[in-house]
């Protein structure tokens, strides 16, 4: 009987056994007193009862013998794990006595024992199966309280024993009638199960072609439908037999989870992954909702970010463990009755090279198709994410533009002088771009500042190098022109007339060509776009006055007055005051480090420095660096006049603002003595920014905050070999 591997179908003895099954108190008395004294009550029931009890005793003795043989086999095979045998003993003691003396337990033991002897490598699988069966038929703790309570009551009140015996016999009779009534259903379900198993085996033996995969009635789909029906029949049969439907598969094992430090969250996640029903794989959203519910119900007080981190860690851990369980279930249950006799050393692909090559080709094809499917949906996901990102950027830009509209309307309003302030068309774009960059991230702003500092340092180095070269050229020219009088008005500029005066002349185009950028911030600054005809006329007037030999200072002052708006043109009284100040300033001796007089702001190739004084903004970073390098000296309180000139293709545009001595006046860099020329103004050569006069500062409205402005000069566009300034040495 022990070596029998087939499933034994229950015979009519089980019906008699179930019919003659005693109450809960009788099975406990039978094992304790198996002698002839206990056989008295059974003899009173007749010959049928004695035969049933005899069959039960035979089953029990046989089951005990089979269980001992299985334990001996486990001792030999599981010497590395000695705790296996005591664990099996404990489970047997906790099992129900009726189940231990049943034919079902005998069939399970015989099957497990025979398979363990044939396949010792899978011994632990069969041990697990036996443990699952014993746990399913173990005595529950709640059921153990009833016999104890009845025993106490029987001890205290002996006359109540006969009614309890009557109730036990009544329940036994009802159970026997119910069992006899469902006997026919059980037999019918068993026949259906056998029929389904035979049909499934027949379908598994059929060859499946690739063309049949799309057929809705293919053998593979028929087999899947029959297996689902078989599972439902098995569950119904277990309900009728009042036994557990667990089969010991890995997929049925409960997964304990202790991944977080919060027991409430652990219990919620464990309940989620061990939910009864189909093996569903929870996604990140399910885990996050479970964590949030646990935190809300138990008032954990965790922030949103920490809940997300907990959910992410739990999702990774749970996903790995569920994948491992599915993989093990696939390994244990893969195949069919055709692969039951498979051994690792008898693979036909090891001896047949054609089959091995075909299997490798099929595997390569399967992996390539799998990669195509994965890449397809990965690209679809990337496209959807990119589309969402672009929509988000569009919304942010729309909101930023809507917030910039009131600012632009306030900036375009009328100033205190009654004239609408106009802005340079290049500045709003730069300001909006800077604001967007500031709103996006501060790192980009720091990188831009570093790049600007590097660019200004490179420009300073280029300017210094060009200044040294020009100084050498000026010294050579000064040696050749010593015979000329320093006071005689010599021609200063020799300029080539442009053949095409109609070439686009605008301040914006000129600044783009020469690399100049400015940010006006007050209504006192010049309008951004003078007409080309005005620029040409101003250039012609400048050329005529230069040829007539007029003083450059007067020329520059008159052109400056013409360029300024009407409200900013000084009255005759103010002109007299400014002229008196200019005379007093010119009468004061200004001392340089080498004792030379100050000269005009003339560029290296004969042009006037193109750094327009725009507003009362604080000095730029470059100017602060120059001021630090300058340090305290004799020029700290000197009077410096900045002259600015911007060359256009059709003429010259010059603006001059005088800066008298004031606490607000900034100190320009010290010019080298080699840059001195014979000029009527006798002022310092400088190319730094200038501050406006106090009168202009007072006219600036207090409500308008000064804006920083950066002026960049491209040295490469200034050095024109055809425009030469003839310099003379004043010494």
From Swiss-Prot:
Location(s), subcellular: Cytoplasm; Nucleus, Nucleoplasm; Nucleus, PML body; Nucleus, Nucleolus
Ranges of Acidic residues composition bias in the record: 432-482
Annotated Polar residues bias: 165-176, 398-412, 499-509, 599-608, 672-688
Post-translational modification: Sumoylated with SUMO1 on multiple lysine residues. Repressor activity is down-regulated upon Ser-661 phosphorylation. Upon neuronal activation dephosphorylated by calcineurin in a Ca2+ dependent manner at Ser-661; dephosphorylation positively affects histone H3.3 loading and transcriptional activation.
Biased segments, Low complexity type: 31-43
Region (Interaction with histone H3.3): 181-414
Pfam family, any one: DAXX_hist_bd
Positions where Phosphothreonine occurs in the chain: 456
Coiled coil: 177-215, 368-395, 428-485
Region (Necessary for interaction with USP7): 345-560
Motif (Nuclear localization signal): 391-395, 622-628
Domain of life of the native organism: Eukaryota
Annotated crosslink Glycyl lysine isopeptide (Lys-Gly) (interchain with G-Cter in SUMO1) location: 621
Keywords tagged on the record: Acetylation, Apoptosis, Centromere, Chaperone, Chromatin regulator, Chromosome, Coiled coil, Cytoplasm, Isopeptide bond, Nucleus, Phosphoprotein, Repressor, Transcription, Transcription regulation, Ubl conjugation
Location of the region described as Sumo interaction motif (SIM) in the Swiss-Prot/TrEMBL record: 724-731
PTM-bearing positions, type Phosphoserine: 25, 211, 409, 421, 485, 488, 490, 499, 527, 551, 571, 617, 661-662, 679, 693, 728, 730
N6-acetyllysine modified-residue sites: 503
Region (Interaction with SPOP): 617-731
Any Gene Ontology CC annotation: PML body
GO molecular function, one term: kinesin binding
Family as reported in the entry's similarity comment: Belongs to the DAXX family.
Assembly and interaction partners: Homomultimer. Interacts (via C-terminus) with TNFRSF6 (via death domain). Interacts with PAX5, SLC2A4/GLUT4, MAP3K5, TGFBR2, phosphorylated dimeric HSPB1/HSP27, CENPC, ETS1, sumoylated PML, UBE2I, MCRS1 and TP53. Interacts (via N-terminus) with HIPK2 and HIPK3. Interacts with HIPK1, which induces translocation from PML/POD/ND10 nuclear bodies to chromatin and enhances association with HDAC1. Interacts (non-phosphorylated) with PAX3, PAX7, DEK, HDAC1, HDAC2, HDAC3, acetylated histone H4 and histones H2A, H2B, H3, H3.3 and H4.
Name the UniProt record assigns to this protein: Death domain-associated protein 6
Organism (species): Rattus norvegicus
Taxonomic lineage of the native organism: Eukaryota, Metazoa, Chordata, Craniata, Vertebrata
């Amino acid at each position: 009987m022990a070596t029998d591997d087939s499933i034994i179908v229950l015979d009519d003895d089980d019906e008699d056994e179930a019919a003659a099954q005693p109450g809960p108190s009788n099975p406990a008395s039978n094992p304790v007193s198996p002698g002839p004294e206990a056989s008295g009550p059974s003899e009173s029931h007749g010959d049928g009862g004695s035969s049933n009890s005899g069959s039960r005793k035979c089953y029990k003795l046989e089951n005990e013998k089979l269980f001992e043989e299985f334990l001996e086999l486990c001792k030999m095979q599981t010497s590395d794990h000695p705790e296996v045998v005591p664990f099996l003993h404990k489970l047997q003691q906790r099992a129900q006595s009726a189940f231990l003396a049943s034919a079902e337990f005998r069939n399970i033991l015989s099957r497990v024992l025979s398979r363990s002897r044939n396949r010792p490598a899978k011994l632990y699988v069969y041990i697990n199966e036996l443990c699952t069966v014993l746990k399913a038929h173990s005595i529950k703790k709640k059921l153990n309280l009833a016999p104890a309570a009845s025993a106490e009551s029987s001890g205290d009140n002996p006359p109540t024993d006969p009614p309890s015996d009557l109730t036990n016999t009544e329940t036994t009779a009802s159970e026997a009638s119910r069992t006899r009534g469902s006997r026919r259903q059980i037999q019918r379900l068993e026949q259906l199960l056998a029929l389904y198993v035979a049909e499934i085996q027949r379908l598994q033996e059929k060859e499946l072609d690739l063309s049949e995969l799309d057929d809705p009635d293919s053998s593979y789909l028929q087999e899947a439908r029959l297996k689902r029906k078989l599972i439902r029949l098995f569950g119904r049969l277990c309900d009728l037999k009042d036994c557990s439907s667990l089969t010991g598969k890995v997929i049925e094992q409960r997964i304990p989870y202790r991944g977080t430090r919060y027991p409430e969250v652990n219990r919620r996640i464990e309940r989620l992954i061990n939910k009864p029903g189909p093996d569903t794989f929870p996604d990140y959203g399910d885990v996050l909702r479970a964590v949030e519910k646990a935190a809300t119900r138990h008032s954990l007080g965790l922030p949103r970010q920490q809940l997300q981190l907990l959910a992410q860690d739990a999702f990774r851990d749970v996903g790995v463990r569920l994948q491992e369980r599915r993989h093990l279930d696939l390994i244990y249950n893969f195949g069919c009755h055709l692969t039951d006799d498979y051994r690792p050393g008898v693979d036909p692909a090891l001896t047949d090279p054609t089959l091995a090559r075909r299997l490798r080709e099929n595997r390569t094809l399967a992996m390539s198709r799998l990669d195509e499917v994965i890449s397809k949906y990965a690209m679809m996901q990337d496209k959807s994410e990119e589309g969402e990102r672009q929509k988000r950027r569009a919304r942010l830009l729309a909101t930023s533009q809507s917030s910039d509209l009131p600012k632009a309307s306030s900036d375009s309003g009328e100033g205190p002088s009654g004239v609408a302030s106009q802005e340079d068309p290049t500045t709003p774009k730069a300001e909006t771009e800077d604001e967007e960059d500031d709103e996006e991230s501060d790192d980009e702003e720091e990188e831009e500042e570093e790049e600007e500092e590097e660019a200004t340092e490179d420009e300073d180095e280029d300017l210094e190098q060009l200044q040294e070269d020009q100084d050498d050229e000026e010294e050579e020219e000064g040696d050749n022109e010593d015979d000329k009088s320093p006071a005689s008005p010599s021609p200063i500029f020799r300029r080539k007339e442009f053949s095409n005066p109609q070439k686009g002349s605008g301040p914006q185009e000129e600044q783009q060509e020469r690399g100049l950028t400015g940010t006006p911030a007050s209504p006192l600054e010049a309008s951004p776009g003078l007409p080309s005809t005005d620029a040409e006329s101003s250039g012609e007037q400048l050329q005529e006055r230069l040829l007539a030999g007029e003083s450059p200072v007067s020329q520059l002052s008159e052109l400056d007055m013409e360029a300024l708006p009407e409200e900013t043109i000084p009255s005759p009284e103010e002109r007299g005051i400014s002229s008196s100040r200019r005379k007093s300033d010119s009468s004061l001796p200004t001392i340089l480090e080498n004792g030379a007089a100050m000269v005009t702001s003339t560029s290296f190739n004969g042009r006037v420095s193109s750094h327009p004084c725009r507003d009362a903004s604080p000095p730029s970073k470059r100017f602060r660096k120059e001021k630090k390098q300058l340090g305290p000296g004799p020029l700290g309180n000197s009077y410096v006049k900045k002259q600015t000139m911007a060359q256009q293709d059709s003429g010259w545009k010059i603006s001059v603002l005088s800066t008298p001595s004031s606490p607000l006046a900034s100190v320009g860099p010290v010019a080298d003595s080699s840059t001195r020329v014979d000029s009527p103004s006798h002022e310092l050569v400088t190319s730094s920014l200038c501050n406006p006069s106090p009168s202009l500062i007072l006219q600036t409205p207090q409500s308008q905050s000064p804006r920083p402005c950066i002026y960049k000069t491209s040295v490469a566009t200034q050095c024109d070999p055809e425009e030469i300034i003839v310099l003379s040495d004043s010494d």
